């Protein structure tokens, strides 16, 4: 077990969560004369860059190693934050998004793969949960710091964000690479095996995508509309955002939870919980209950992300890890386009329709997850019979 890697990843997660301007990123851009339409185009550039660079980064990572890939990606991450600080025009922010896309696609799967290989398999879930917890803690500290120090100095918030990301770039040099098992190296160029692995994982990737995107959309875009409809004053939104981030710290309890409840059974419980919450918010007219429901949604989303990191890494046996994880991520980014458009159409009709669509997605996700779980269980039993005739 590479204990130094674990501690370094916790520090990196915290530092990269310190985005001091996150709560005013829209205002920051509008102050530079960027319109909302231009912001949409800028975010589209990010999405395109992530899709374009995802698989190439996976291939590069399998060739040069996890540590070097993370160091290079964190270098681009720092440059993206520096570009954001310096940007004053549309093209300046486009450059920032391109750099961020390169960094995000490089880190995607690579950091979790190295972390997974740095701990015993039975401790992976808890480690992923704590890593997510430290990232959330960083976001909470950033939100508080903005209110205390940067509320009248947006440029200062961007500068200190860049400084924190430079620190994470430097710290990433202290990571130690972990070599893959020999059998994985022997099939490093096996595109067929990689494709077969992705095909087997398709149902669970669809399932997790439907749950996480449903919860993310509701808690990021539609919660404010719900708060207004139940009479919560706008000045409370910042505090509720802080509480929502704190709820994400619950991922630190995953190790304890999965010791008592089998991982896949707990995942199924999260799907049921998400569907019930989506239906419940339709009939909710209470301010307190609305807040509680959205906090529970954040909890379900955060825990699903952490558990999926374990499931995805566990599925890789005999294929190049980074390339396979990149293909998983590529599929999910493509799926995000579908869910985003679907929620947009539903929300244009009514908020109730968007909540109902979320419930449908979660039920479909549950069915897809159960299908994957049963197929995997049958495959495991078959392999056990063949190995013990």
Q: Where are the model-predicted features located?
A:
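Helix-loop junctions on the cytosolic side of multi-pass membrane transporters
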Residues: 161-164, 169-185, 371-383
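Cytoplasmic helix-loop-helix junction between adjacent transmembrane helices
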Residues: 98-136
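C-terminal ends and interior cores of transmembrane alpha-helices
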Residues: 75-88, 272-285
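Helix-to-loop junctions at the C-terminal end of transmembrane segments
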Residues: 54-65, 150, 250-263, 347
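Transmembrane alpha-helix termini and helix-breaking/packing motifs in multi-pass membrane transporters
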Residues: 140-159, 228-230, 256, 337-355
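Helix-loop boundary and gating motifs at the non-cytosolic
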Residues: 1-52, 200-242
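Paired small-residue
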Residues: 91-99, 288-296
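Juxtamembrane intracellular "pre-TM" segments in multi-pass secondary transporters
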Residues: 1-3, 176-206
């Amino acid at each position: 077990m590479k204990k130094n890697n674990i501690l370094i990843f916790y520090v990196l997660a915290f530092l990269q969560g310190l985005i001091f301007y996150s709560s005013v990123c829209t205002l920051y851009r509008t102050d530079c004369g960027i319109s909302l339409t231009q912001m949409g185009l800028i975010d589209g550039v990010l999405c395109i860059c992530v899709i374009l660079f995802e698989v190439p980064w996976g291939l590069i990572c399998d060739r040069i190693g996890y540590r070097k890939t993370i160091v290079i990606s964190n270098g681009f991450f720092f440059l993206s934050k520096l570009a954001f600080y310096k940007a004053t025009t549309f093209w300046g922010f486009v450059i920032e998004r391109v750099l961020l896309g390169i960094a995000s696609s490089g880190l995607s799967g690579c950091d979790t793969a190295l972390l997974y290989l740095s701990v015993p398999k039975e401790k992976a879930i808890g480690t992923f949960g704590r890593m997510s917890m430290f990232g959330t803690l960083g976001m909470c500290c950033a939100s508080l710091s903005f209110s205390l120090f940067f509320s009248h100095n947006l440029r200062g918030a961007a500068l200190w964000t860049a400084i924190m990301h430079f620190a994470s770039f430097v710290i990433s040099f202290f990571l130690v690479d972990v070599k893959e098992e020999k059998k994985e190296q022997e099939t490093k160029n096996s595109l067929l095996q990689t494709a077969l692995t992705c095909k087997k994982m398709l149902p669970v990737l669809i399932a997790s995508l439907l749950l996480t995107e449903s919860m993310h959309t509701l808690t990021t875009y539609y919660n404010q509309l719900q708060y207004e409809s139940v009479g919560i004053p706008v000045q409370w939104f910042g505090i509720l955002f802080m509480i929502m981030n704190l709820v994400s710290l619950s991922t630190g309890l995953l190790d304890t939870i999965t010791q008592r409840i089998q991982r896949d059974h707990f995942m199924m419980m999260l799907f049921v919980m998400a569907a019930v919450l989506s239906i419940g918010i339709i009939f909710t007219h209470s301010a307190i209950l609305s807040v509680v429901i959205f906090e529970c949604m954040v909890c379900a989303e955060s825990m699903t992300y952490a558990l999926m990191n374990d499931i995805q890494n566990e599925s890789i046996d005999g294929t190049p890890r980074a390339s396979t994880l990149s293909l998983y991520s590529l599929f999910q980014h493509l799926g995000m386009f579908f869910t985003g458009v679907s929620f947009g159409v539903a929300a244009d009709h009514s908020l109730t329709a968007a909540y109902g669509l979320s419930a449908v997605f979660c039920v479909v996700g549950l069915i897809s997850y159960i299908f994957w779980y049963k197929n995997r269980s049958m495959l495991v039993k078959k392999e056990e019979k063949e190995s013990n005739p």
